[in-house]
């Protein structure tokens, strides 16, 4: 039974999106996991905690015996059934625990006894995590071009369309502003970093990559923060700024934040609850910048938002949202971005409309 334990093997697992049957407890998995991993634990959180206490008080042999006692009979059979099904569904997958220790070896042995030979990650999640960290450090050393521009400039789409582009907001499941949340919950910080590393490895492996194309992001994207090694390189990068007409930006924002978000919420929750979730999403976004706007201006814009939602509910038209979106851009988002851009003006090497920037990026 071949085990994979070299640095190149670990990288190959991430590049290939190799299915990983992660047998750690759910609490460990939630703190950090690899992108292609599914959690089928040997022990649940309570069982793991009980074995941990036993280990501290009585030693490893007693802890092992306690684990076998807790995972026995019907519980063991249920978990065996889940592992067997996962192995058959993912014949080219691999087992993983925290450090490639007893848990993955126990599951591997039980599967072997049931007629299934399945490899495991020698070194476990810890080894894969270190590989992800090191890969990000190395790959971040390549030159970077940042795509900048005011809100609604189509920066994310431009990055997505580049073969050497990495969509940081897509990986973070957040669009980086007060209205940036999506219907998918954000990953833990470690899981986000692992996903980013895997994406960079895959992008680099599939071409002769000379430079990265990334969106000009701040350190935080929602609750996730960029790895320091990448953030540091981004502060040194050149910037291409998209300068589209205001009307074009409004069309994009209408599509992305009103039409698409309303569709996504109703698709996920049904018409009635979806509408409520959509309304709360917009109000929450505006409320998040209440202090920046000042109470009086916030109340004015919130009233316009309510009126726009009433119009949208009764007529289906999203045009009413311009009454609060336009001043929000003119008074808050655009001045804020221009101020940030002024501080790094010496790094700006190209200005142009969306298509011009997209064409320029191809020449780099």
Swiss-Prot record:
Show where the Rhodanese domain sits: 14-137
- Transmembrane residue ranges: none
The record's Gene Ontology biological-process terms are: tRNA wobble uridine modification
EC number of the protein: 2.9.1.3
NCBIfam families with a match to the protein in the record? PRK11784.1-1, PRK11784.1-3, tRNA_sel_U_synt
Q: Which family does it belong to?
A: Belongs to the SelU family.
Annotated protein name in UniProt: tRNA 2-selenouridine synthase
Q: Which organism is it from?
A: Escherichia coli O127:H6 (strain E2348/69 / EPEC)
The lineage is: Bacteria, Pseudomonadati, Pseudomonadota, Gammaproteobacteria, Enterobacterales
Q: Which gene encodes it?
A: selU
């Amino acid at each position: 039974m071949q085990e994979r334990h070299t640095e190149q093997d670990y990288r190959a697992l991430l590049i290939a999106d190799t299915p990983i049957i992660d047998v750690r407890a759910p609490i460990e998995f939630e703190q950090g996991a690899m992108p292609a991993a599914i959690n089928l634990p040997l022990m649940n959180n309570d069982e793991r905690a009980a074995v941990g206490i036993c280990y501290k008080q009585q030693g490893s042999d007693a802890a092992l015996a306690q684990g076998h006692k807790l995972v026995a009979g019907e519980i063991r059979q249920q978990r065996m059934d889940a592992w067997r099904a996962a192995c058959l569904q993912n014949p080219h997958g691999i087992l993983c625990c925290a450090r490639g220790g007893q848990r993955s070896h126990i599951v591997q042995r039980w599967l072997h006894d049931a007629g299934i030979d399945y490899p495991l990650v020698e070194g476990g999640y810890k080894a894969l995590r270190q590989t992800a960290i090191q890969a990000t450090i190395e790959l971040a050393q390549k030159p970077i071009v940042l795509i900048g521009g005011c809100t609604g400039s189509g920066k994310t789409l431009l990055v997505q369309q580049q073969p050497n582009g990495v969509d940081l907001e897509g990986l973070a499941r957040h669009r980086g502003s007060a209205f940036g949340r999506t219907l998918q919950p954000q990953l833990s910080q470690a899981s986000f970093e692992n996903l980013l590393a895997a994406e960079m490895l895959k992008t680099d492996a599939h071409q002769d990559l000379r430079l990265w194309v990334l969106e000009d992001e701040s350190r935080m994207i929602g609750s996730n923060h960029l790895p320091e090694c990448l953030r540091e390189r981004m502060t040194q990068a050149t910037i291409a700024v998209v300068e589209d007409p205001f009307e074009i930006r409004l069309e994009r924002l209408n599509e992305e934040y009103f039409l698409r978000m309303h569709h996504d919420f109703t698709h996920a929750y049904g018409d009635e609850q979806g509408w409520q979730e959509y309304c709360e999403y917009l109000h929450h976004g505006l409320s998040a910048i209440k202090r920046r706007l000042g109470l009086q201006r916030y109340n004015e814009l919130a009233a316009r938002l309510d009126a726009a939602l009433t119009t949208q509910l009764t007529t289906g038209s999203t045009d009413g949202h311009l009454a609060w979106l336009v001043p929000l851009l003119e008074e808050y988002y655009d001045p804020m971005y221009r101020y940030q851009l002024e501080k790094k003006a010496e790094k700006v090497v190209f200005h142009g409309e969306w298509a011009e920037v997209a064409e320029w990026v191809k020449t780099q």
